[in-house]
Amino acid sequence: MSKGKRTFQPNNRRRARKHGFRLRMRTRAGRAIVAGRRRRGRASLTA
């Protein structure tokens, strides 16, 4: 029996749309996430 295809099919546009900076900035919670990552000194804030 085959397992089927892999579920992760990379796509940069979809990645940015779902987890990107602009999306994070839309909501208060998203802005809090970015602020937390800035505070922690993350090299990459969002996808």
UniProtKB/Swiss-Prot annotation:
PROSITE patterns: RIBOSOMAL_L34 (PS00784). One of its GO terms (molecular function) is structural constituent of ribosome. Pfam families: Ribosomal_L34. One of its GO terms (cellular component) is ribonucleoprotein complex. Keywords: Ribonucleoprotein, Ribosomal protein. GO terms for biological process: translation. Residues 1-30 are annotated as: Disordered. Residues 1-29 have a biased composition (Basic residues). HAMAP family: Ribosomal_bL34 (MF_00391). PANTHER family: LARGE RIBOSOMAL SUBUNIT PROTEIN BL34M, MITOCHONDRIAL RIBOSOMAL PROTEIN 34 FAMILY MEMBER. Belongs to the bacterial ribosomal protein bL34 family. This is Large ribosomal subunit protein bL34. It comes from Saccharopolyspora erythraea (strain ATCC 11635 / DSM 40517 / JCM 4748 / NBRC 13426 / NCIMB 8594 / NRRL 2338). The lineage of its organism: Bacteria, Bacillati, Actinomycetota, Actinomycetes, Pseudonocardiales.
